[in-house]
UniProtKB/Swiss-Prot annotation:
GO terms for molecular function: ATP binding; RNA binding; tyrosine-tRNA ligase activity. InterPro entries: aa-tRNA-synth_I_CS, aa-tRNA-synth_Ic, Rossmann-like_a/b/a_fold, S4_RNA-bd_sf, SYY-like_C, Tyr-tRNA-ligase, Tyr-tRNA-ligase_bac-type, Tyr-tRNA-ligase_bac_1. It is found in: Cytoplasm. Residues 362-429 form the S4 RNA-binding domain. Catalyzes the attachment of tyrosine to tRNA(Tyr) in a two-step reaction: tyrosine is first activated by ATP to form Tyr-AMP and then transferred to the acceptor end of tRNA(Tyr). ATP binds at residue 235. It catalyses: tRNA(Tyr) + L-tyrosine + ATP = L-tyrosyl-tRNA(Tyr) + AMP + diphosphate + H(+). CDD domains: TyrRS_core. This is Tyrosine--tRNA ligase. GO terms for cellular component: cytosol. Its EC number is 6.1.1.1.
Length: 430
């Protein structure tokens, strides 16, 4: 499998330094992608870089994932308009351990294969590096003129950012360049890959390698992922879509991919899955024949959810989706954990009632009219119940004066009332 050809048909090549393809064709190459450790989880904005490493390893090359422990203490000005908060070492080490666990779902770190993945942290070689070392070994090789010509620096100096550019952030490209030099000298790493906003920093590294010891190193970047409507990829109203289920439930993760547009689904299934070209072409053709069936979105959501979480989490997410949008049973509803239940019914009207009242038992008509205003009047509720239009926990309410007790609670805390086909209400017993 040819790595560059694989990336090309997937739409994952933005820029590539001349000679890169020839290098990859003649030998097993070691390459790295830098990962910002400012959180203890990756989010889907990291996934393109991670997938590039995954394809790289599948093509027989050796991937390095570089945790920017030192550079994460500073902040990269590329594409940013303000200084970043700096992290302490203990937090960075914790974040690194969490990130490695996530990367292990994509990369082989454990086998004896010569191209097994490695995780490195630039803090390990930068922590003993003095300012005098830096000035002598790095600073003297790169001119200020060269650094000022970088687009990320120009933008910050030309007034796009109110705070200007600190010296710390100005030197970031030299630190990233030194990472490349260090990995070139210690790991034989000849290629750095990243997002297109990293081109300037990566080429500073190739230039530093050339000027320091006459070595040849290469750069490859992928496009920054956008949405077809121009919106920012990977962000929702509630923030990032994280890979860690503590921050984004598998259900919400699955729903994100399921709800992308047709145009985005066709691009994303190439970028964020390992499906081959023939299978993707077949899925696209099938989707185009019947777009309303959302074949692409369903397969995309399945592949990414299984890869990031598990088959079990994927199946649970599908079951949870069917509860809201399909003809699910009360048994399926009872299987939901509390987080998924709340995620599925996020945004529906909620009412609080006293748990003590349920211990003795309460008539449904009193509970849903007097205690929680699901219905405007008892007459309205009686009429809907008689017409079969009211369900409690996905079971039709048999009588409007049916007695409800704590035994009916989901997760010992919730009652789900459905009025008609689409109106849901969540009652919380406290």
């Amino acid at each position: 499998m040819n790595f560059v050809e694989e990336l090309r048909w997937r739409g994952m090549v933005h820029d590539m330094m001349p000679g890169t393809e020839e290098l990859l064709a003649k030998e097993q190459v070691t390459a790295y992608v830098g990962i910002d450790p400012t959180a203890d989880s990756l989010h889907i904005g990291h996934l393109c870089g991670v997938m590039i490493l995954r394809h790289f390893q599948r093509c027989g090359h050796k991937p390095l994932a570089l945790i920017g422990g030192a550079t994460g203490m500073i902040g990269d000005p590329s594409g940013k308009s303000a200084e970043r908060n700096l992290l302490d070492e203990e937090t960075l080490r914790h974040n690194q351990a969490c990130i490695k666990k996530q990367l292990a779902k994509f990369l082989d770190f454990e086998s004896d294969a010569p191209n097994r993945a490695e995780l490195v942290n630039n803090y390990d070689w930068m922590k003993e590096f003095t300012f005098l070392d830096f000035a002598r070994e790095v600073g003297k090789h790169i001119t200020v003129n060269y650094m000022m010509a970088k687009e990320s620096v120009k933008k910050r100096l030309n007034g796009e950012a109110r705070d200007g550019l600190s010296f710390t952030e100005f030197t970031y490209q030299l630190l990233q360049g030194y990472d490349f030099l260090h990995l070139y000298e210690t790991k034989g790493c000849k290629l750095q890959m990243g997002g297109s906003d990293q081109w300037g920093n990566i080429t500073t590294g190739t230039e530093l390698i050339r000027r320091t010891n006459g070595g040849e190193a290469y750069a490859l970047t992928c496009p920054l992922i956008t949405k077809a409507d121009g919106g920012k990829f990977g962000k929702t109203e509630s923030g990032n879509i994280w890979l860690d289920p503590r921050y984004t439930s598998p259900y919400k993760f699955y729903q994100f991919w399921l709800n992308v547009s047709d145009a985005d689904a066709e691009r994303y299934i190439k970028i964020f899955t390992s499906l081959d070209k023939a299978e993707i072409d077949g899925l696209v053709a099938e989707h185009n024949e019947a777009p309303h069936l959302r074949v692409l979105q369903k397969r995309l959501a399945k592949e990414v959810t299984v890869m990031v979480h598990s088959e079990e989490d994927y199946n649970a997410a599908v079951d949870a989706s069917n509860i809201l949008f399909g003809n699910a049973t009360s048994d399926a509803l009872k299987k939901l954990d509390e987080d998924t239940l709340l995620a599925v019914f996020e945004g529906v009207p909620q009412f609080e009632i006293s748990r003590d009242a349920l211990v003795e038992g309460v008539k449904a008509v009193d509970l849903f009219v007097d205690n929680a205003a699901v219905f405007a009047s008892k007459g309205e509720m009686r009429k809907l119940v008689q017409g079969g239009g009211v369900s409690l926990n996905k079971e039709k309410l048999a009588a409007f004066d049916q007695v409800i007790t704590t035994a009916d609670l989901l997760d010992e805390k919730y009652l789900l009332v459905q009025r008609g086909k689409k109106n849901y209400y969540l009652i919380i017993a406290k």
